[in-house]
Amino acid sequence: NLGDYEIDTVIQTRAKNECLLTLTDRKSRFQIIRLIPDKSATSVNQALKGILQNYHINSITADNGTEFSRLADVFDPECIYYAHPYASWERGTNENHNRLIRRWLPKGTKKTTIRMVAFIENWINNYPKKCLNYLSPRQFLLNA
């Protein structure tokens, strides 16, 4: 179903500074990316509250990172699923999209801008996918 998302964070450097919060819709492959100040549960929840103003999310699947420990503050607990430890394939769509982000922001990138994040999000959402019959996620949503 549309609205079932996988969530993750993409760290730019080992320093405890800003990172990317990524959400990927399982069906449409639509990607939402937000630059957050740190990898804390507070920053993640604050970003999610902003995202929920513009997007409908039915369920969310996360890994067991501490940044996702307070998702129940934002979502109904029945809508939250946690992947098994060390089982990244349970959130494969999100992991593949994170690899696409790395094309533009390789590991060790010191700093990025909101403009660059918006560019990457737009590029991913307009990239044709074989699993969508060569439609982009944006085209798929328009046809849904």
Residue ranges and their predicted role:
Residues 8, 23, 29, 48, ...:
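Mobile genetic element proteins and their domesticated derivatives, centered on retroelements
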Residues 27, 47, 116, 120:
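Catalytic phosphate/metal-binding cores of nucleic-acid and nucleotide-processing enzymes, i.e., regions
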